[in-house]
């Protein structure tokens, strides 16, 4: 029996009645036992995840996570049913993120580490949920932290079918540790798959140092002093076939190598980072999102560095209402919508459907896409599942967008409607599902997400 079959059967055996679910059960982590040739499951990645687990369990980190819970509880969102119910998951999730950043800060022994991901079990390691800042379920996120005084080479190999887009973004700091801004920090350099020079066998090399390119292809220049964050995003539209790009990094020059840090030192750094990240993202949403009207899409904006368009908002719905959004892909290679808890941590997306992209969703007859956000399953294929909660954030991203697109064309309509009238307002030909079909949809999604562990 294949791993995918085991995963799908495990989901089916949960016996969930998906129609009219009022409160979600705790999501189960993706299960996989990938071979040692796993693209993401390298020995360095597994060692990284083990150290993250050790750091999270230290008293200093546990104390800081408790402070984050208190911070969230004191915020206005902490008084809402959805906000109160998700404080623990959100605080623990961003705590894992802080530990990931801290462990990855060894610029003398660098690694391109998979981060900000769903709970998963592999190689005997259980990694808990890590997410914040409305992480995109369509992305495989990897981080590399580098020293401006050193020189690095990133070696990659693309396996077809490749991601719909791969994007390397060099930032001046870890998002959430600098001044508040719409992008969470300053972008220093970018490199996308459209610019990347790749050999016939799918391999490539990226150089990263403080010198100009001087004729070098695939070069990213950084300032000569300080530590900087390289974020790598492999964007999947087709979870069932697309593969992450194999990446490895070597430090090829720089100052003398410093001694290894102890877990205690890393934990102190992680706690400091968490004390910055949690208030930052709380302030971020309180400044940029929550002052707007609920259940309303904000004006679509152009993102820097050729990263397309984005918009979003927040929803607050009673159990008998739904938010109906109709979007235009405007020719983008990828258009995706997702929902998160009120703190910006994605609702469960490995085996529930809290996100959909234009390859996963069912289109309308005119090529647009209509999505439904509702606490209870309305039986619509394009339903976004908030795990039984009536509130949270939503984000919409259009990536690899053609030239000349008008951002205002991307939103067709939005409305809050009673669930009793939902079928009246949905476009003709809307794809509906039975509870058993929903279960099959979820099982297929879980199997496709588990490919990331293989």
Model-derived features: positions:
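Gram-negative bacterial Sec-dependent N-terminal signal peptides
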Residues: 1-23
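A compositional/structural signature for long, glycine/proline-rich flexible linkers
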Residues: 25-454
């Amino acid at each position: 029996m294949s791993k995918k079959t085991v995963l799908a059967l495990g989901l089916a055996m949960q016996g969930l009645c998906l129609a009219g679910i009022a409160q979600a059960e705790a999501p189960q982590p993706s299960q996989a036992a990938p071979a040692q040739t796993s693209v993401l499951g390298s020995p360095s990645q597994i060692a990284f995840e083990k150290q993250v687990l050790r750091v999270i369990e230290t008293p200093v980190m546990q104390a800081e996570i408790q402070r984050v819970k208190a911070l969230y509880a004191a915020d206005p969102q902490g008084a809402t049913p959805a906000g109160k119910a998700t404080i623990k998951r959100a605080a623990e999730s961003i705590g894992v993120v802080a530990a990931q950043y801290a462990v990855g800060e060894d610029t003398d022994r660098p690694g391109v580490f998979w981060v900000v991901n769903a709970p998963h079990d592999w190689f005997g390691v259980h990694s808990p949920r890590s997410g914040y800042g409305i992480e995109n379920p369509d992305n495989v996120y990897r981080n590399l932290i580098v020293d401006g005084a050193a020189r690095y080479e990133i070696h990659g190999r693309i396996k077809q079918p490749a991601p719909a887009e791969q994007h390397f973004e060099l930032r001046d700091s870890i998002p959430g540790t600098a001044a508040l801004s719409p992008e969470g920090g300053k972008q220093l350099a970018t490199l996308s798959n459209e610019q990347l020079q790749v050999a016939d066998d799918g391999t490539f090399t990226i150089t990263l140092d403080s010198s100009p390119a001087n004729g070098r292809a695939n070069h990213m220049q950084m300032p000569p002093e300080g530590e900087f964050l390289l974020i790598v995003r492999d964007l999947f539209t087709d979870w069932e076939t697309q593969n992450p790009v194999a990446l490895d990094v070597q430090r090829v020059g720089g100052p003398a190598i410093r001694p290894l840090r102890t877990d205690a030192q890393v934990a102190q750094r992680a706690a400091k980072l968490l004390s910055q990240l949690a208030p930052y993202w709380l302030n971020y949403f309180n400044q940029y999102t929550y002052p707007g009207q609920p259940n309303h899409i904000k004006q679509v904006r152009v993102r820097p560095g050729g990263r397309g368009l984005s918009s979003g908002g927040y929803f607050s719905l009673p159990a008998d209402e739904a938010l109906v959004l109709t979007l235009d892909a405007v020719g983008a290679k990828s258009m995706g919508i997702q929902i998160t808890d009120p703190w910006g941590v994605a609702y469960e997306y490995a085996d529930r459907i809290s996100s959909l992209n234009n390859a996963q969703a069912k289109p309308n007859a005119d090529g647009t896409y209509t999505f439904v956000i509702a606490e209870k399953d309305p039986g619509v294929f394009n339903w976004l599942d908030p795990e039984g909660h009536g509130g949270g954030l939503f984000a919409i991203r259009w990536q690899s967008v053609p030239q000349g697109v008008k951002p205002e064309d991307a939103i067709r309509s939005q409305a809050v409607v009673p669930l009793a009238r939902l079928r009246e307002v949905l476009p003709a030909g809307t794809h509906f599902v039975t509870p058993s079909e929903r279960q099959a949809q979820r099982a297929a999604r879980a199997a496709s997400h588990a490919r990331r562990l293989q």
